[in-house]
Amino acid sequence: MEDSHSSIWEHRQAELWDRIFQVIQDVVTLADSLEDDAGGVIVKQEMVKTAMAVGTHLVRANAAEEPGDFDRHLTEARMKAIETDYWLRLAYVLQQKEEVQRDLSSIITQYAGIVDLLHKFIRHTRTEKNVINRHTKGPRIQ
């Protein structure tokens, strides 16, 4: 049973990496299409910065040698995902173009899924022994 449980979490971790890379690409592409008017520059910069920080903290978690560092970086990745969601929602309010709002809405939905997955992953890592030894696989390069 433990092997299948571990396998499920390895699959979820791989899913998380795939989703993070895709949504970061979507955020960067979207940011390039936003206007640089009142406050727009700051919103774009912060949106991209926090989106990329999610991946950065996941990489740091995977490189952690101590369970405390692993947990801290996973938690920080989740907080950065929540912060990115804030910037995306702010951009949605500031943007008047329907097509941009549609794209933002899609990305916001993706971030809700990522925040949920990170929350489940954090809960999993806090309840299982030796989790750091099994979940330091990093992103898959294809």
Give the location of each predicted region.
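Short, C-terminally biased terminal segments at protein or domain edges
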Residues: 1-56, 64-142
